[in-house]
């Protein structure tokens, strides 16, 4: 209700919270809370945790048991509860950036990741939304999951997927990430310009003497295999 003070404030987490969904996951007659971890500040795209809060007579308490399957699950951009299998308990579907859509089945005491069972393990993408419905009117739950659109500077295919490396590249305590793209020779090249890299990683300018040289350097030639293996 507009103007009302919050009835409860949840303790802050390391990750940035994203999508929030409600369902009676423990079937006790009240709504429990799923909070999606969107990202970890200054550590993109390191996988983030998501959390389950159980409603106990109007007070939401984080449940380590229910939250366990969502530790380090990824950059969760959207979530929806739905009754997917034959029982009456709400299951959970997630859309994750730099990952796959994920399906978690409710057992009554926790969630089990059944993404592979539903054939979604190979559908990697920059997923940003998910919803459910009986779209073909056959009595079964269908999914609609949205990915990054074609009106983007990014493109990918099964043969040439998008690849990103991330980690503390030079042990300075700063989390780095490197976007790449496949060249005509099927080798990986840095996607960002030399100027972008120089701003984020000034030491990288020692690796090339001209923009022309940089434009022809593969990822391994620019960073070296030992650096890439760290990420």
Predicted feature residues:
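Beta-propeller-forming repeat regions
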Residues: 1-231
């Amino acid at each position: 209700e507009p103007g009302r003070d919050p009835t409860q404030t949840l303790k802050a987490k390391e990750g940035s919270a994203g999508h929030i969904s409600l369902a009676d996951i423990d079937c006790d007659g009240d709504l429990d809370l799923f909070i999606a971890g969107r990202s970890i500040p200054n550590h993109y795209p390191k996988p983030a945790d998501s959390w389950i809060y159980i409603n106990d007579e109007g007070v939401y308490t984080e449940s380590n048991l229910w939250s366990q399957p969502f530790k380090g699950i990824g950059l969760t951009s959207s979530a929806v509860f739905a009754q997917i299998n034959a029982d009456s308990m709400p299951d959970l579907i997630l859309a994750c950036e730099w990952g796959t859509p994920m399906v978690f089945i409710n057992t009554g005491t926790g969630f089990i990741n059944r993404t592979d069972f539903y054939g979604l393990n190979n559908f990697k993408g920059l997923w940003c939304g998910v919803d459910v419905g009986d779209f073909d009117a056959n009595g079964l739950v269908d999914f609609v999951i949205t990915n990054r659109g074609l009106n983007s500077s990014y493109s990918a295919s099964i043969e040439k997927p998008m690849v990103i490396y991330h980690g503390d590249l030079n042990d300075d305590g700063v989390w780095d990430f490197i976007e790449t793209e496949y060249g005509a020779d099927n080798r990986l090249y840095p996607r960002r310009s030399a100027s972008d890299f120089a701003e984020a990683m000034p030491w990288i300018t020692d690796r090339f003497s001209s923009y022309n040289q940089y434009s022809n350097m593969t990822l391994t030639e620019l960073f070296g295999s030992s650096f890439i293996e760290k990420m």
